Amino acid sequence: MFFYPLDHVAVAVTSLEEARSVFQLLTGDTCSTPEVLESQGVRVQFIGSLELLEPLGPESTVGRFLARRGPGLHHIAYRVPNLPQALARLKAEGVRLIDDVPRPGARGHMVAFVHPRSSEGILVELVESEAPVTS
């Protein structure tokens, strides 16, 4: 059996600046430099192992999420050493995937998402990384 360590928890926010100030006070962690992921329509910033997601527009995935649900938990992410292998194993076990093939994500890592219908309603991201990820 394989177990993957938790990489980060992501929160959808309407404003990185406003959310950053609150979460930095709560955690005391330092913030990464904000990063724009055009392909995903989002601006991200890490505070320790918390990822803040701000949509670039209302039609982005995170923009639609905010319109439907408001700010809050967006996904949890697990670190995997070999993403294609992890995806193949999950698919063979009948897990429904959003991404059959890894794609570029934040911090230069390749990522893929598991459909919430296969994970008790929670969007799960897999992040390819051997080492612990830091902001």
PLM regions and their residue ranges:
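A cross-kingdom feature marking solvent-exposed beta-strand/loop segments within repeated
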Residues: 1, 7, 19, 24, ...
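Vicinal oxygen chelate
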Residues: 1-2, 6-14, 43-48, 54, 63-89, ...
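Alpha-helix N-cap/helix-start and coil->helix boundary motif
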Residues: 16-17, 59, 83, 120
